[in-house]
């Protein structure tokens, strides 16, 4: 190939370190084209709620069955197939919304943050799916941003830098920290994050990042 677009700087470095000689560009984040727009939301009040969309089975994301033990004041809204709620710790903190198509989710998402996490553990992202977060750009991150949801993401994920630099969410080492972090986040800080997220969401809807990578 004459030119390869890596998902992000971490993936670009991995390709270079592993012998890729092609010219490399960087995408930054996946655009997310959809005719649907996020519904305007009233002012957010505490306690915050966290949305997770994706595979919900214990095999793919066992962390979902452990995280409830560390939740006290906020709630988790789960979208997807295969959640076995009776196996989950702290199941009273979960709202299982079932499967919703992405375009519909943009317009109807219930939550204040979108969670990007994978694997078996709440204390770090483990296993093949979890470790891959160090190199890839999960589509769900872009989906959350189109829903105008600031992102909660693993600190070592490749996209954590993008989240930090753009002020569109929170980077955490462990989900065990989430209760304390959400309790101390002011409504003004959240409103600023949400405003920045909406701005990036606008870019995602226009194919901004692909166009930039091709320049």
Give the ranges of each region predicted by the language model.
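Well-ordered beta-strand positions
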Residues: 2-3, 113, 150, 168
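Short beta-strand scaffold positions
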Residues: 6, 153-154, 172
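Carbohydrate-associated surface elements
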Residues: 10, 29-30
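Conserved catalytic-core segment of nucleotide-activated headgroup transferases in glycan assembly
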Residues: 30-107
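Nucleotide-sugar-dependent
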Residues: 107-147, 153-161
């Amino acid at each position: 190939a004459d030119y390869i677009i890596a998902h992000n700087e971490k993936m670009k470095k991995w390709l270079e370190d592993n012998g890729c000689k092609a010219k490399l560009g960087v995408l930054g984040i996946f655009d997310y084209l959809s005719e649907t727009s996020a519904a305007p939301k009233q002012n957010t009040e505490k306690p915050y709620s966290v949305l997770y969309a994706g595979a919900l089975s214990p095999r793919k994301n066992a962390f979902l069955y452990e995280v409830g033990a560390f939740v006290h004041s906020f709630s988790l809204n789960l979208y997807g197939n295969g959640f076995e709620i009776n196996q989950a710790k702290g199941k009273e903190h979960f709202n299982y919304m079932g499967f919703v198509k992405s375009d519909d989710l943009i317009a109807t998402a219930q939550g204040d943050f979108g969670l990007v996490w994978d694997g078996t553990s709440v204390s770090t992202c483990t296993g093949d799916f979890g470790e891959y977060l160090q190199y890839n750009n999960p589509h769900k991150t872009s989906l959350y941003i189109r829903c105008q949801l600031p992102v909660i993401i693993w600190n070592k994920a490749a996209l954590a830098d993008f989240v930090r630099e753009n002020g569109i969410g929170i980077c955490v080492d462990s989900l065990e920290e989430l209760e304390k972090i959400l309790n101390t986040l002011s409504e003004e800080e959240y409103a600023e994050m949400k405003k920045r997220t909406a701005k990036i969401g606008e870019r995602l809807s226009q194919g901004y990042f692909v166009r930039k990578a091709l320049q």
